[in-house]
Design a protein with these regions (language model features):
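N-terminal signal-anchor/first transmembrane alpha helix
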Residues: 2-27, 60-71, 77-94, 100-156
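Interfacial helix-start motif at the membrane-water boundary
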Residues: 47-60
């Protein structure tokens, strides 16, 4: 066995292919009754490729990441461009899902994991944390956990305080804050 050969999960191509397979096989929209209790029509409707929708653009970012080496940029410039692409794609995913009111499905979990792995590779190319992929991935996971379980829900609560249904109602904030039980 070749000792210098990297494990398959340390290849960018693995994560790109995994994200594409997830897009093809898993629903990109949330299923109301879960993966196994949904009907075949609901399952088909939740697939990102079943109709022209925003979820196909979400997965385009990993394909663009795979095409970055074709630009033949210097190593540092390419790594920075990859990180900008990943950051822009992640921001686009969450902003567009919020604006379009799309509930994310199982394939998006794989997409976020793939984007995290690809960001890890790009940070390692830049020698962040001495290029230690484990430390970089751990730090990224901690940051993502804080964002998804603390920052995002808090922002969602504050945004809902300013809206009454679909209408902007800033006076509602004072009404909520002056409740006796708060």
């Amino acid at each position: 066995m070749n000792a210098n050969k990297l494990p398959i999960i340390q290849s960018a191509n693995f994560w790109i292919i995994l994200a594409v397979i997830a897009f093809l096989l898993l629903p990109s929209h949330a299923l109301d009754y879960g993966l196994f209790e949904s009907t075949s029509d609901e399952y088909l409707g939740a697939m990102g490729w079943s109709s022209l929708n925003i979820t196909a653009l979400w997965f385009l970012s990993v394909i663009l990441y795979g095409l970055m080496p074709l630009l033949k940029l210097p190593k540092d410039t390419q790594a920075k461009a990859e990180l900008y692409l990943i950051a822009a794609a992640t921001l686009f995913i969450f902003v567009s899902a919020t604006i379009c009111k799309v509930s994310m499905g199982y394939s998006v979990i794989v997409l976020i994991a793939s984007l995290t792995a690809l960001a890890t590779f790009s940070f390692a190319k830049l020698k962040v944390m001495q290029g230690d992929k484990f430390i970089i991935a751990s730090l990224l996971c901690i940051i993502l956990l804080i964002f998804f379980f603390i920052v995002y829900p808090t922002l969602a609560i504050f945004v809902s305080m300013f809206y009454d249904g679909d209408t902007f109602a800033p006076q509602q904030v004072m009404r909520i804050l002056t409740q006796s039980y708060i």
